[in-house]
Amino acid sequence: WPGGVGDKKLGANYAPCVVPQREAMGRGFQQNLWLFGEQEYVTEVGTMNFFVALRNKETGQKELITAPLDGTILEGVTRDSVLSLARERLVPQGWNVVERKYTMKELDEAANEGRLIEAFGSGTAAIVSPVRHISWKGKLINCGLKDHEESGEIAAKMKEWIEARQYGDDEHEWSYIC
């Protein structure tokens, strides 16, 4: 059924992912990028929420984009932290933070046009996990990382900012030292 229970933390959402995950690993990848429907809407990567940073095709403005909470993805606590930090710290630098449906075709087009800046997953265990390449329809899409880079600038900043709050280095209402 459309959407299913993708917005719930259920074993039923994880068990069917084991075989595709093993297939991805057999092809040299660490995770699967989950696409939804005939339109191939980008949803999540592995068990993490997925973000892309790119330049808007019409305006050239930098955007941090993630799928909306429409019932198909988990409302991740780290996703919420990334969005909050992006609105607090990236928007004043001219970024636009967007929750909307976007397709794999759109992501591929942005990469081909040199507008894809970076991509990463976010989740409780990893905090952020940079994405180097996406294999789609027989081609390898470069997600903006150079050969010598392990992380893009936004993913690195998000990890740094979240850990600073987790460890009490950045005083914030999210953190309480007991």
Write out the residue ranges for each language-model feature.
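Helix-start/capping segments and mature chain N-termini
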Residues: 1-178
